[in-house]
A protein has these predicted regions:
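Short glycine-aromatic motifs
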Residues: 36-38, 54-56, 60, 114-117, ...
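Signature of long, low-cysteine stretches enriched in small and polar/charged residues
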Residues: 108-150, 154
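Short, solvent-exposed coil/turn segments at beta-strand boundaries
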Residues: 52, 86-87, 125, 151-158
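Short, hydrophobic/aromatic-rich segments at coil-to-beta transitions
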Residues: 35-40, 72-79, 122-138
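Short, aromatic- and cysteine-enriched interfacial helices/patches
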Residues: 3, 26-33, 43, 48, ...
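Secretory targeting signatures
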Residues: 1-32
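Surface-exposed amphipathic alpha-helical segments
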Residues: 54, 154-175
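Secretory pathway targeting signatures of secreted, lumenal, and periplasmic proteins
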Residues: 50-101, 139
Length: 175
């Protein structure tokens, strides 16, 4: 029973991010600015590297925001979003802390059910790589743009990283 509650909440957290990314074709036009130096950040108590050329938009930062869970499993989410100056490249990080419950591979696989995913290890972290195509629009025609997601467990928390380029995961995730 506890597994089902955690899985449902994890699904809701990931779907929120996926739907937001799909709706904007992961353009993330809400992010702006630029930074020429790489930086190290902490989201939900976990350290990440952000490559040079990306800047965080504080408007989209979440810091231990409590859920409005109706399932009885309380959790908090922390998140940060980054984009380059041209608003063509983006990185989004979300960490879900389920308090007394630990996220497991079984929970993540349940959450990703129905999605095409590949088990992968990035910088020593075993997780799940998902690629989805989102429809964006140029001035004259619709285009298909890939969005990549890497989902894994760290310290019992759910870690979700979304990016416009799969190669960013190796830069963002710290060994």
């Amino acid at each position: 029973m506890k597994f089902n509650r955690i899985a449902i909440i994890a699904i809701l957290a990931i779907l929120t991010v996926v739907l937001a990314g799909s709706a904007s074709a992961f353009d993330l036009g809400f992010l702006g600015g630029g930074d020429s130096e790489a930086q190290q950040i902490t989201v939900g108590g976990i350290d990440f590297n952000i490559p040079a050329g990306f800047t965080e938009n504080e408007d989209y930062k979440m810091d231990n925001e409590k859920s409005n869970s109706t399932t009885g499993v309380d959790y908090t989410m922390s998140a940060a979003g980054f984009e380059d100056d041209k608003k063509e490249k983006a990185i989004y990080i979300l960490v879900g802390d389920y308090r007394d419950y630990n996220v497991t591979d079984q929970v993540i696989e349940y959450v990703l059910d129905g999605m095409d995913y590949e088990k992968k290890t990035i910088n020593g972290h075993d997780g799940y790589l998902v690629q989805q195509n989102t429809t964006g629009s140029s001035s004259l025609m619709a285009t298909e743009q890939p969005v990549y997601m890497f989902v894994y467990e760290e310290n019992g928390d759910l870690v979700f990283i979304g990016a416009t380029d799969e190669s960013y995961f190796g830069d963002v995730i710290i060994e």
